[in-house]
Amino acid sequence: MMGNKSVTKTMPGLLRSVCLLGLAFSASILHATITVTLSASPASPQPVGMVITWTATVHDTEPGTHDYQFSVGPANGPLAIVRDFGLARQLPWAFSKTEGTYQVSVIARNTSNNTSAQATQSFVATSRWNGVDAVTPTANPLVALFSGPPCVVGNRVRVRFTQTGSSVSQITNAIACNAKKSANFYIGGMYATSQYRMHHEIISSTGALVRKGNDFTFNTGSIPAGITFPAVTVVTPAQPPSSKTAPILLHDYLGYVPAATDLSGNVLWYYQQKVGQLTRAEAGGKMLMNNSHNPNLYYNTLLEVDLAGNITLWTNVHRINEQLAQMIGPNGQPRRPVNQFDHEGRRLADGNIAVKASSEMMVTNAAQCGTDSNGDPNTCDVIGAQLLILNPNLQIIWAWDAFDFLDINRPANLGETCVQGDGSCPIFFLAPTANDWLHANAIQLTPDGNLLFSVRNQDWIIKINYSNGTGDGSVLWRMGYQGDFTMINPPTSPLCTTPDQQEAYQWFGHQHDANFEFGGESVLTTFDNGNLRIARCDTNGNNRGYALTVDEANRTVTPILVQDLGSFSKGLGTAEVIPGSPNYHFENGYVEPGPYSRSQEITPQGATAFEMDSAGVLTYRSYRMRDLYTQPPPL
């Protein structure tokens, strides 16, 4: 039994009303007592890449709390929401793509009486390219802004940069040429206090080099004294070819700023602020992050940042819940609200964003809550999960709620519970304690248009019927302990003898970061934390790295790799195939005693090809990367 199956639909007209400005106000707006003005500092015009602070000033004859939504677009073109309704009345914004006339719009609303006002201002961004390329420092001392020339339409332009004295270069993503406007790139992936040479390259549609520009030099600055990083120890040095095809390691250090290092631990990039989680890097040099665990839902946020540290997209749980309240869920009722963003935010191939959020519900259920002295079920708080798809305008276009599709009678396999203030759990509000039913942690859009969802506390990876946005949300299959798949030639242990123990041992458990690899659906990797296996029978067991061949039609999997990783991380973890290599990358994110985190490269034969420990830190995820721009084919 997989719970009730029901289609999540938006209310008629909702998307039409939110696509432009995300509003659904009544005609009383025309008679509102509220006005707003918008000012820019520094004033227009300013060169491309200059950070402009936009300030909204409200005049309102009525009391109440005001929130603000900011949108940006070309002059006489469509506006795109870049910061959805929040309490901040300022928007720092850099016009970093190219020169031109832009418009910035703000809507200020009084949340007490639902009145609003709008203001729009034009702004001119001038070119930094003046017949010659230009290289400009940014607020991040390790990042430069490179401004290159216009070029023939049909070609593409990119930047190649090389540390002085080195023969190893990096290249940015290539963007389409514009015959009249400059091309601008943030250059990231450079060591501190070092000199680099960089030039633009024009390439054809087939990737052939058409011409390259002259070299320009840039000297990176020092990392500020207040920014610190964990001490690292390289246990096994990296070796070619993977040390060349994927020389960068992007770390989401918990309690530190996110950072990218080389394979010796030397910093190449960092984000200037601590965040809740860096979930995924995007092609082109942007990253998705969240800030969770704030009971003020305006400050429970999802954000996208560029390499210079500019926030390019921002929304919050309060705004998401406004949208959910306007969507029809099961039984014709409004959808449940969510409490926080956590664990996953991921840009999809179509430009939409998949994000995981936590929710909760009071249930009266014997399996979840136990029974009273009369044998009647108790009532308790249960933490669930929602999977939301946002369009590029940060508006929900599809939603899935585990309470509607998973079996509430199947509690967490190890009976996990949460108490208020426990940082390892999502926040919750309805009771002093709650059942940590799912603790889901990873989303992937599969090539057939459905969604892979890792549900840690159920010891399952499930596939959800998304059908590229038209699916009904039904669970197509469950892989793992007590699931729908049979493992061919499973691993065994003399410690695990009963059928239940054997099943717990063969499968991944309490897993993290499940993904199909190689652009298909035949090879799946995941990080096996192993909590269930160890609790059932595998005393003193370690984490394992999994790679499986998957036959969906016959519901079978065959192990390619089930590798003992030599340590135990009770939570956190990463698994991936290393770009340009047959080897695997695993991150043991919470190793004890310590704690510390361990990055490992494992060959298909199970040998350790690289190992680096980061002391005194938990690492949510880490990724081996060719550079800060190139990602595997988006799924």
Language-model regions: role of each:
Residues 94-101, 187-195:
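Surface-exposed, short loops/turns at beta-strand junctions within beta-sandwich domains
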Residues 127-161, 175-184, 191, 195, ...:
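Histidine-/acidic-rich catalytic cores in large beta-rich domains
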Residues 62-69:
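Solvent-exposed loop segments of extracellular immunoglobulin-like
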Residues 44-50, 134-138:
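Short, solvent-exposed loop/linker segments at the N-terminal edge
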